[in-house]
Amino acid sequence: MSLRSNKLLVAAVIFTVVTFGLLLTSSIFNNKTTTSLTYGGILPKFGQRIIEKKSNEEYIIEKIEHTQKDGEDVRSTRYLTHHSYLLRNLAKMEVKHHGKDFSINDICYKPHNAIFETTFAPENIDKLPNYLQRLILEAQRLSPCLIVTPLNCYHDSYRIHSEMSKWNTSNVTNFLNRKLRNSYIDAIGESEERPYIKSTYGPDLIKEWAHLMFKLPSKQTSSFSKKDLSSKIELWLSSIESKTNLTELGRPSEVDNYFDICTSMQQVHDFDERKRKFGLYDDDDEFLIGLDCVENKTKFIEWIQERELRGVSKPFNPNQQCDGIFKNSEGLEFFYGTRSFGNNTAPFDKMKTEIGLMTPEQILTTMLHSDFVNGFESIWTIERAQELLDDFRLAIRQEVKRFNENRSSLKIGIDTRVVQREESNETELEISSNLDSVVYFILFIRCVLLIFFAFFAWSVNPLRSAVMFLVRDALTSLLFSILCKSDGQIELNSELLGYIILLTIVNTYLTTRVSWYKDRNETCIQRAKDFPSRSNFSLLFSIDSLRENCDSRQLQYALAKLSKYLTALDTYSTETFMQLPNYWPFISILFVPITGCYWYFVDINLPKISVVLLPSFIVATIEQRQVEKSLLKERKAKKEFQKVQKKKMEKFLSDGAVDRLLSGNSESVEDKKLYKSKDCVIHKESAGRLYELSRSSYDVSKIMAYPNQRVRDFRFDALGCYFWLMKLKSAGILLYGSAVLFVLLSVAVMLIPIQRTSLQKDMNNEVYFGFSINNMSSDWANINKNLHAFNSEIDSIQSLQTISNWKKGFDRFEGRFYKNSSRISDANDYVEWMNQEPINWSVMAPLTRISPKFGIPSPFKFRFRYQIEVNNNESEVIDTVQRIDTLLTKYKGTLSSPIVDGVLYEYYHGNAAVWNSFVFNELLASGILSAFFALIVVIFSITPSISSVLIFSFFVIGSRLEIAAVISLFSLDNQQLYTDSAVLVGFLVAWAPFYELSLFRRRLLYKLKTRCTPELSSGKRIRPPFTKAVDTAQVFAIVLAASLIIAVVAGVVPEFQKFFWPTVILIVVQLVAFGNSIAVLVATNQMFEREVRNFLDNEFELGNGTTAGQVCHMAQKLIPPKYDIPIPMNDFHIRPTNMSKFYAPPPAKKRAKQTNNETDPEKKEDEPGTSNANNVSQEEAAHRLAILPWHFVLGGIPVDLTTRSDQIINGPFIGISSDAMRTHEINSELEDQDDYSSESSVEDVESDPAPEEEIKYHEENMLHMIEKVQKDAAEKEAKEKVHQVESAQRRAPNFDDPNVAGPSHRYQRNEERISTDIVPADPPREIPANPVPPPTHVLVQRAPRPHEMPPVIDRTIPRDPRTEPPNLQECIQQNDDPSLPPHPRRHQYPDHYGRAMISYCEDVYWTYNDGRLPPNVAMPPRPFDWHYRRVAPPEDFNYVPPPGQPSIPIPAEAMALREERARAHREQEQRDNSQSPSPSPEPGL
């Protein structure tokens, strides 16, 4: 098969090229900002990246908040002590990384290290002597971490820093002492003086060993002096000393602080508020009434000491400094005490703490320096540093989680949490802390889908389909891991969850599609023939044998065969119009710029989406290609086998084997082998030397092997609705016109201004102003002036509070050291400030390190840190964000475009920016995708028209626009995920039915090599194919049912409740996509009809006859009456001009007993002329009339003599119409078989008709009887009718029961029947004076039988191939093999039926009950087998009962009667044998 014919393979090639092109382009753009490339292995590591690394970051802040659930004031000893327990737990926490234990002291940010950084450049530290490097390294390790906590106002913070930096830990300090002593001994060499310092306090060891080391002689360098280093050590030691004005948390405060507490208490007049704020008791109100803080000072101090101060809060002044061991930080806003408290439900019910951590770059620098000093070969990389940082951040969260579960936390009602730095982590379904629930939910979704599709879609081979589903998942995971990792890692976030959802949708759809494709091709009914049949009549002739009133089982059989045939026709067809256009390679080049535009302007993650979908698509292509190749190979082998069998048969007929067989001689071994080798005829030999037919290709048990009746019923209902939609005219225009209106309305909704934001209290409210200024040194004065003006305007915003601003700290430094206000500042003053106050400089550290030698670098990068005060006033926050935006615009030129980031700011600013541009982005994306889908239609939908391209593209894009409108209306997050899912689902739902319609349209319009069908004239209607539409409806129903269950579970299970609304949105996506797909089908079908009518009117003059009208009758078989959706035949444009021909096997003809009025049996009935026509009419009348005894009718339901008077025959016969028969349900026994037993009370339906004179006589007599009984019958009409209907329904046979004879089907059979229900006898009537003899028989009239119907097309006239379709019999007879012997059952069929036609009628489906049928569905019998099922089997007189007593006692009289019958039977056999002639001795006769 050429590449042009395999459209799926072409699509896979294009998809692969586009995907790898996008990956290459994105990698090129990403590498422009990459400085170095390192090899990190093929497979990535999956982890939870807590934050995305922000470039230009001085240090990382981890925020921890304590919230009192009852709204109590947390500024008390009780809650502060509880907070100290958490910090101590964090200080003791260790993380194992690459086989080594690390503590938080190893990765925390330490401002005191700036004391040494301002003295030595990194390249100069390595030039120091080894003992001095060791001294600096150990001093840096003992430096306290940057922790902003209310405990810094108390001496308790030193205890926490001591535990964190291990100042007093004996084993650590002993090891520190040995390391310093060893480095000192190495420096002095072979000397007898080996000092030893006895101390267990780390700073004292640094002080003593530094005093000894500075006495050692060393080479003088120009970069440093021992005096400078000694001063730095002294500065470091003084910076970590305890402040003198700090008190212990559990001790009474100083006397001055008591006065402040008393004053604060008196300012609160409400005792309840005072009690809540200061933690007082009920009996304290009496003491505080009339208290004077000045006169009663001593009394108040004694009272508060008695209260032990633990239950009384210590108020924090607004500017109180909680700097702890950070000296020389006066006026530094970073350590303001009010920053440590906040409010959630009540004032001061929240306590805040900040812990500074090093960035990965700083960790890498520290670890490399440590390994260098220790003499180790360092293996640290930036990736390992990032891993260590992430491990610690996760460990902090785990520790906080355990701390919340402590008994003390539960007792005092404290809830502790770690504040996320990024907004994305708040909206990522909290993956970092709830990874287990996300994983479980994903597994739950996939398990539910697998179960549903295994039971309701993959019924033929669910194990194979499930395995291929998992194989696609595995290949996708592998390819995604290799191509889409970032820094050797794949982050588990909402973006990855979206990829999994898209993969699940596509993988499920493709698995189902390939499963059905494989099963239908394997059971194709036309596998042995050469495909394709070049006439579009092949779409219709396989259901020409359907009757209008056939049961649903026959309909299902025909539809299954048609579905298989259509699949095979699309698979193996080599017609030119089904191939891709010659210019498809040039058109496919347009995919590259289209996808590139979408990637660049709309979604930068398009390469990852393509990688997720590519493996499933390629595997599906490979599977389908393998199915095609295997079946083509099988067809080729079967043809070769048929040729060999034909030669064998010719040899078999010519070598005398048939003569030997017919002569009665036993078969030879070679003959038996020959019989068994003919697999197409003989399957296996039974015990009685009878041979069973093998399963032919007509067996539809596999294609119909749905798991239960409900699936089959759903497909029938879907097909009926499909036909109902396709026949709409004006209503169809209204339907897809409404869909167009909804799409346009969605665009209008997105333009409506909506208040989209709501105040987010839990968001990180910090704002960072980032600057990058060139030539800072040369333009210092002007830039400082602009910075001063910028700070003034920032300070004017009341809701912004300063946290760190190096410009303010530098101005304070200049004010203290340079009293002259007129002095002009320069860049050297900044370097001086850095040397004088290194800790303050480090806390407010710029992003770029200052070198004393080279001065301020260019560009000079720094950040200002502020905080937005959130006071439950959203309008104030929005106003602050707007003023910040205005300020940035104002200083865009003078300060080199400062950049602002922050969670709360970005939330409000981003919402405004995103929603303002949301409409533009969606319209741009819709325009690009419409071009993409139009290109798909142009290449793959077989020469489409412009209208079809616009229809398909518009409605598929409409799904995205409608979901975008919902997102805009409700301000939903994860917009890209929902819109991508909408456009993908919309394409999958609409493409397959649309493609099938396009293919059918192209077959009809193929002018040169395809004949035109007369049923498609301008006044008639196209019957579109339905297989893909029903398949799509089934897949959609399964996915929707599974989604509803998932939504219910997500709403009930607490761990999954966060996924409830996303699941609901995905359900809405499915409904919207399905609605638009219906609009696509209706609009496309009506467009195709107009196009085909115009073409046919212009090209041909069409005739009238047709056999395709029966296609229209399928609709009325598919919708049950309870739905009340009438689809009458008259509503369809295609109408049959004559009755269709039914090719079911006719019953064997048996001569009835001749009467005196019967014609001579030797008279030729085939003689043409009037007499022959009369014979035919009489024969048809005999088939449609049956004579029943009158007592049979009286035993059932009486004839309605009031409403059916025109159909009643006078005299002893009564005629019953087919409508009445349909109500009474007994006609199944009249139509089943013509050969009835002589003992039956019903005469043979093939008996001769009654003479016309006799019928006329009875009609006249019957009129008199009608006049007498009509009055009485009218009075009881209503009551009897109700009783008749109820009785018929109550006693109707259950054909779904396999023990009841008759076909199993869903709906009431549309056949004429008479009920045998017994009803109460009528009350006695008055006997008339001249009574009319009662009727003795009933004349029943029924519909003609299939073999009684006249031919649809008169074949006495040569067929016009342009206007007349081929006959089914002609299609089958042309494949008849004349070399084969006659069929064994030829006596049951007309004489003109060949072997092929009889084989077609002798379908294994009707013959053997060995097909795979669903439960509770009985195999219907062959039409000819009704006779054998109705009569009792012959009695076996040679039967020997088994030993033992029977379970049911048999009377002796019954056994005697049986013996008498057996004796009579044996005597009769002896008489028959004695009278039979002797066999002829001649062989072969």
UniProtKB/Swiss-Prot annotation:
Span list, region Interaction with fem-3: 1131-1271
Name by which UniProt lists this protein: Sex-determining transformer protein 2
Organism: Caenorhabditis remanei
GO terms under cellular component: membrane; plasma membrane
Compartments, as annotated in UniProt: Membrane
Top-level division of the source organism's lineage: Eukaryota
InterPro entries: Ce-Tra-2
Listed GO biological process terms: cell differentiation; hermaphrodite germ-line sex determination; hermaphrodite somatic sex determination; sex differentiation; spermatogenesis
Function of the molecule: Plays a major role in controlling sexual cell fates. Promotes female development in XX animals where it sequesters one or more of the FEM proteins to the membrane thereby freeing the tra-1 protein (a putative transcription factor) to enter the nucleus and promote female development. In XO animals it acts as a receptor for her-1 which prevents it from binding to FEM proteins thereby repressing the activity of tra-1. Negatively regulates male development when bound to fem-3 and is required together with tra-1 for promoting spermatogenesis.
Lineage, highest ranks first: Eukaryota, Metazoa, Ecdysozoa, Nematoda, Chromadorea
Gene behind the chain: tra-2
Subunit and interaction comment: Interacts with tra-1 and fem-3.
Keyword field: Developmental protein, Differentiation, Membrane, Receptor, Sexual differentiation, Signal, Spermatogenesis, Transmembrane, Transmembrane helix
Signal sequence region: 1-28
Annotated coiled-coil segments of the chain: none
Primary site of residence: membrane
